[in-house]
Amino acid sequence: MTDSTKQKGLEWQKQGLSDNERLKAESNFLRGTILDDLEDGLTGGFKGDNFQMIRFHGMYEQDDRDIRAERADEKLEARKFMLLRCRLPGGIIKPAQWIEIDKFARDNNYYQSIRLTNRQTFQYHGVPKTKLQEMHRLLHKLGLDSIATASDMNRNVLCSSNPVESELHQEAYEWAKKISEHLLPRTNGYLDVWIAGKKVQSSDSFLGQEDEPILGKTYLPRKYKTAVVLPPLNDVDMYGNDMNFVGIQDEAGKLVGFNVLVGGGLSFEHGNTKTYPNVALELGYIPVEQTLKAAECIVTTQRDFGNRADRKNARLRYTLQNMTLDGFREEVERRMGFKFESIRPFEFTERGDRIGWVKGIDDKWHLTCFIESGRITDKPGKPLMTGMLELAKVHTGDFRITANQNIIIANVAEEDKQRIEDIAREYGLIGNISKLRENSMSCVSFPTCPLAMAESERALPEFIDELDNIMAKHDVADDYIVTRITGCPNGCGRAMLAEIGLVGKAIGRYNLHLGGDRPGTRIPRMYKENITLPEILAELDGLIGRWAKERNSNEGFGDFVIRAGIIKPVVNAVVDFWDANLIPTVTA
């Protein structure tokens, strides 16, 4: 580590550490006093540090905000429950596992639903505290867990859900699993709390033998997201992750290495110009056999240099700002013991899922079902949850959750194809969906998310209905615009990589961002601030009308609004996300 690198990367050490750092240091390797709270029947939630500690075990405490005020008027505690997010690198799950997951959701979940996430896994909303150990023990029995799917760890690792290139996808999937396992915490805290139910005291001698060689005793400074992706399909929204491995093939189609890109992230804070979303930047190329070494050294560099004083500036993109990309690369190379090679050529052309049937190179069929906002539940006329259960009872392949919140019924034999399609159609898993809707996304937001400022999942269907009408009005109904709504600027709906991105500001009001692109390589800029959905639709009516008439051949909406001068592109978000007048001058 050079003196210049140290100086550029560690200025935050002059400030006091955030309280989360104390919490982690005193947690007995993430055990806390969670078991004591589980025995407390006076509250449906967790107290003190445990409110944060359960996040390391893949859970968040929430409540039903629709009835919060009503319960307060009645002098009742908010209806508290937990969100649990499963660890499922690459998103592959077996039908037998799904059957048990479905049963738990029906029997123990306030909302009787399963939510597919754009982190390529499933989560439960509305699990009462009294059912948490039962839930974790079920996952354990199924060979699953929820370790490190939240808080200051490497989250669920994404992987391209490419059902056509089966052999290459399998290789990429195996690497996603290896990366996930390699970067997991080594503590037995999760098993002690949730499976064994064993209380551990800080004085217990064996704690002195526990070690976290990669993550460290206080783990990472902030959340950390990783993806493995196979061009040309950017279905994992690679540019929004902290660490990305872009698969490179040789002439024979064999996976030979990865381009590594780092520092993507989509969260920011309204009005706080020290925060910004940004796309991942190119670090270099590595041969495939060096993948785990590179992943570890990138993570440990972030562990040691990431800001532990200000959590709003703790993600890897801010570390790059402090160290510079070259300084960060230098430190990673020092730890690896070898240098990155030059980036290999690659290109992304799209990122949506191939809805419907596709045939793989192994002659197996794969059915991708569109699930709006990833919500699998039974509604009148659309019993998706029962449909998935019926498919799980007969399907002999596997299910693949996609990073677009959809699900693939994968590895269907020719002779089983019609039966699978009949079930999917009967229960509404196949239907006539517009291209616009296929390329839409939302976060959960109300009523369960404590950070929600505006509706998202519940607003999306009607908003897309109205936008579909506008598309039809201008004779572009067969085309699409990547459209996303997120209920706050935390970024879960990935609106900061959309062509049209809505970011919740207050109840019924949003900031409208425009200018992302179809492959997902550009941050959209704010076009209008704090406006209502009807006002947004009126703005988009005029803009889509212009796009329909003035666009070049195959020009996406996001590219058009920039070329037409309607909005300026975000060139370097560190500098110009908040002020287009600061766009760096690009020289040829």
From Swiss-Prot:
InterPro entries according to UniProt: CysI, NiRdtase/SiRdtase_haem-b_fer, Nit/Sulf_reduc_fer-like_dom_sf, NO2/SO3_Rdtase_4Fe4S_dom, NO2/SO3_Rdtase_4Fe4S_prot, NO2/SO3_Rdtase_4Fe4S_sf, NO2/SO3_Rdtase_FeS/sirohaem_BS
Keyword Iron-sulfur: yes
Description of how the protein assembles with itself and partners: Alpha(8)-beta(8). The alpha component is a flavoprotein, the beta component is a hemoprotein.
Organism: Actinobacillus succinogenes (strain ATCC 55618 / DSM 22257 / CCUG 43843 / 130Z)
E.C. designation(s): 1.8.1.2
PROSITE patterns linked: NIR_SIR
GO MF annotation, one: metal ion binding
Chain's gene name: cysI
Cofactor note (record): Binds 1 siroheme per subunit. Binds 1 [4Fe-4S] cluster per subunit.
Keywords (A to Z) from UniProt: 4Fe-4S, Amino-acid biosynthesis, Cysteine biosynthesis, Heme, Iron, Iron-sulfur, Metal-binding, NADP, Oxidoreductase
PANTHER family found in the cross-reference section: SULFITE REDUCTASE [NADPH] SUBUNIT BETA, SULFITE REDUCTASE [NADPH] SUBUNIT BETA-RELATED
GO BP of this protein: cysteine biosynthetic process; hydrogen sulfide biosynthetic process; sulfate assimilation
Annotated Gene Ontology cellular component terms: sulfite reductase complex (NADPH)
Top EC class of this enzyme: oxidoreductase
Residue sites binding siroheme per the record: C492
Catalysis: reaction(s): hydrogen sulfide + 3 NADP(+) + 3 H2O = sulfite + 3 NADPH + 4 H(+)
Cofactor requirements of the protein: siroheme; [4Fe-4S] cluster
Function statement: Component of the sulfite reductase complex that catalyzes the 6-electron reduction of sulfite to sulfide. This is one of several activities required for the biosynthesis of L-cysteine from sulfate.
Family stated for the protein in its record: Belongs to the nitrite and sulfite reductase 4Fe-4S domain family.
Name of the molecule in the record: Sulfite reductase [NADPH] hemoprotein beta-component
